[in-house]
From Swiss-Prot:
One of the Pfam families matching this protein, by short name: Yippee-Mis18
Protein name: Protein cereblon
Task performed by this protein: Substrate recognition component of a DCX (DDB1-CUL4-X-box) E3 protein ligase complex that mediates the ubiquitination and subsequent proteasomal degradation of target proteins. Has an essential role in mediating growth by negatively regulating insulin signaling. It also has a role in maintaining presynaptic function in the neuromuscular junction synapses of third-instar larvae.
GO BP of this protein: positive regulation of neuromuscular synaptic transmission; positive regulation of Wnt signaling pathway; protein ubiquitination
Broad class of where this protein is predominantly found: nucleus
Entry comment on modification after translation: Ubiquitinated.
Chain residues that bind Zn(2+): 541, 544, 610, 613
Domain Lon N-terminal: from-to ranges: 309-537
Pathway recorded for this protein: Protein modification; protein ubiquitination
GO molecular function: metal ion binding
Gene name in the database record: ohgt
GO cellular component, one term: nucleus
Species the sequence originates in: Drosophila grimshawi (Hawaiian fruit fly)
Localisation: Nucleus
Amino acid sequence: MDGEEAADIDETNSSNPHAAAVVATEMQAVAEAERPEEQQQQQMPQTSSGEADGDVDGDGVSAIAALATRVRLENMLEVVDNMFDEVSELMVDVTELMQRASELTGTTTPTPTAPENQAENAPEIEPAQPATPPEIAELLEEAIAANPLGHNVLNPGDDARSISSRHSGSDMSLDSPGSEDDSDAEAVPRWIIPENRVRSAVDMLVSQARNQDGGIATLLRRENFLQRVRSMVFSQDRVRGRESDEANLDAGNVVDEELSPELSPAPLDIDMEEGVRFDTNLPAEHSYFGPNLNRVPGVDYLEVGSTHRMLIFMHQHILFPGEVLPFMIDGSIIDEEIHDTGRDGVIFGVGFPLMQPPDDNPHKLYGVTCQIYEKGESGRQMVFYKSRALQRIVINCDDIQGPPQYIARNPTMKCYSKVKVLPEYFLPEPLKCIDMGSLNRFRDLPSMQDKFRRYQLTSTPWPLEACEEYSFEHIVEMARKKLEVHKIDTMPKCPIQLSYWLVRNLHLTEKMMRLTFLTDSVNTRLQIIGSTLKQESLFYCRYCNSSLAYCSDLFAMSKHGVQTQYCNSAGYIHETNTVYRIIAHAVGYSGEPSTEFSWFPGYQWHIIICKFCAQHVGWEFKAVDPNLAPKVFFGLAGSSVRIGKTSERTPTQGNPFVVRNLLHLVFREIE
């Protein structure tokens, strides 16, 4: 027996315990058949018989050798047949298990032995099913215990993190889908697809789905989803096998380029568009409420630190003093409030439940006071109102009387509470408080400002660091330069109003907005704003974390700035951020365009949805008049987007949690 045959038999013995006995029998038969042959060969030189006897002996040896070879081949074929029978029995068990699981869940699961029928019988897959029924969990445990090769199959209790770390030799990072380690490819049988192959295939399908209408939701609803995953795995294997070393190196360079942080595109110059510029005063008037709006007398500012009992509502967005809040509620609520207070002006409180209070007092609710300055006709049940936020307040939750209701959800009941007006502390720059007599005329000369400043520092006991701590002129100048591209020229001069105005127009993160709202010091608020001026930010989908637009593309379609509150015909209030453009292939469209109740006169609106998760993220506004500029812009809904750093953007364009759930689902079905 030669070395190759012995190696084949040894490999077979190691893979199948039943085959070891068969192969041992085979080796014994071959040894017995070869032993007479060796004896005949040893005795042939000593034989003195004739040529006829030698021929007979030679024929006998050949017959014995042929018989031994036939026995050996038959035994090897029997071993192979036994192996195929065991694999077939295993596949039948898997098929029965999947059918039983389908009966328990009420779905029709395709059998792995009939992939051609899978497109017709595939179930509608939901993207998030974290809970596994107890019956299915028991079935999976039985299958894992019965399958000696089941170390690559998911356990019922596995979560996304355990899936990601199952193979220590493979790179399972979603941030780098192009890099994978094939070290585990030979560690599992050929009929089990390695985990890193499935991950790469799913990542490719998700990337393709982003460029199609419907996004990931449509991908999951397709009947042939699992078959498409398998096909993608095999297609990638074929491509990987055909590529040469040089092609692999080039592909690696492409992946590195994709993973490199993408620079923010150059801002568009809207003034270059031909046509009549849109009047930014129109959105600020909220003319979609109609022309019959009446002025309401104003009210005085409340004393800082004083406590008042007033009508309060809840709101899903954070309002800052100076911001306009349009809303639509039952007119009887406000009319009764005017009658009860005996004042012409109306003031009420708005609380922000979504803004987390400080840890030292979790029973506090922060908000603002709002003054109604215009109202619609009172002849119908729902009345339009326009109000403006005035002062920051804090509400003790224990003092609330009545059920708190959101102002955007057509409140029908009243809710009162005691509120305390928060202070606003401002310390002017120390050097500006020093009277230099006749030298004051050099204070505002650009060529003399540095010399004048150095001269002031020599005449004061304060160090330079203390003076710069309360200096905000450089912050205002940096903010003005950054807002030049937004076409905003309504920056207030009062430091208190300026601090709130910058928060609304400099697209801060939610954490920074909370910090700026809670601080009572205007100087500290400006310092917080100044720390974010050099950061490049992106708008991300709040549901799946896909990047939608660059904050550098913000511009003002209203004289109030780039972020404004608008009310739709159903009374829901949207915080809208207007941008020139969005990232390519980031959104799709839903429904038909309409001009009804348009927030921007002369434009039609069209609902846009995230292409990755198919959730509503805003609107596209397109000019109806061809002479109106800009021709097209977008409004991103504040409740559907969040602001984050550009470094958070990943090539997968989606939340890793979504992809991990998808992988969990695929592994449970495909294995």
